[in-house]
């Protein structure tokens, strides 16, 4: 959705939203797998570019927010070094909150233009929630990086790691 919103803004080519594109197929990770490098198969199922973007948005919203209102990061946000912060499903990411709020707020009008008022409202609602949760992550000197699965803050002013993170 991020790149799609950029494309729509720059090109104004709204017809792309209806272009059929195949989905990809890949088996879910097995319990002993943390990641997998592979070439996924193209599915016989296709969907418009808008449908693909909606599925990506729904994936984030299905994971939902953690205890602090931030998106759950699973086994990583943009920073691969954080891949164990949320591996039990409870870790949260401030960066992901900022990014999700930005993308959702930009994608909401796209939903509106597509006549998808319910998804438009849902995107606006979650964008506001994630932005507010990120604001609450201010630690007095910088923003926290996130929270571990056990609820401990990551990158607080009392930590030695993540003190000078570029995104802080």
PLM-predicted stretches and their roles:
Residues 12, 67-72, 115, 151:
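Glycine-centered secondary-structure boundary/capping sites
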Residues 41-44, 48, 88, 95, ...:
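A structural signal for alpha-helical segments
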Residues 53-72, 132-147:
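An acidic intrinsically disordered interaction segment
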Residues 1-68, 93-97, 101:
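Aromatic-rich carbohydrate-recognition surfaces in CAZymes
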Residues 23-44, 70-91, 141-167:
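Carbohydrate-binding/catalytic loop surfaces
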Residues 99-168:
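Catalytic cores of carbohydrate-active enzymes
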């Amino acid at each position: 959705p991020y790149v799609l919103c950029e494309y729509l803004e720059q090109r104004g080519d709204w017809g792309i939203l209806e272009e059929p594109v195949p989905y990809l197929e890949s088996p879910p990770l097995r319990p002993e797998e943390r990641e997998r490098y592979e070439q996924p198969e193209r599915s016989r199922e296709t969907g418009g570019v808008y449908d693909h973007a909606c599925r990506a948005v729904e994936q984030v919203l299905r994971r939902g927010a953690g205890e602090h209102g931030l998106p759950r990061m699973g086994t990583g946000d943009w920073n691969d070094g954080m891949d164990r912060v949320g591996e039990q499903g409870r870790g949260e990411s401030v960066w992901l909150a900022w990014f999700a709020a930005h993308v959702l707020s930009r994608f909401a009008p796209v939903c509106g233009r597509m006549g998808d008022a319910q998804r438009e409202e849902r995107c606006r609602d979650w964008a506001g929630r994630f932005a507010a949760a990120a604001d609450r992550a201010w630690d007095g000197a910088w923003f926290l990086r996130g929270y571990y699965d056990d609820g401990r803050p990551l990158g607080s002013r009392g930590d030695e790691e993540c003190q000078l993170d570029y995104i802080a």
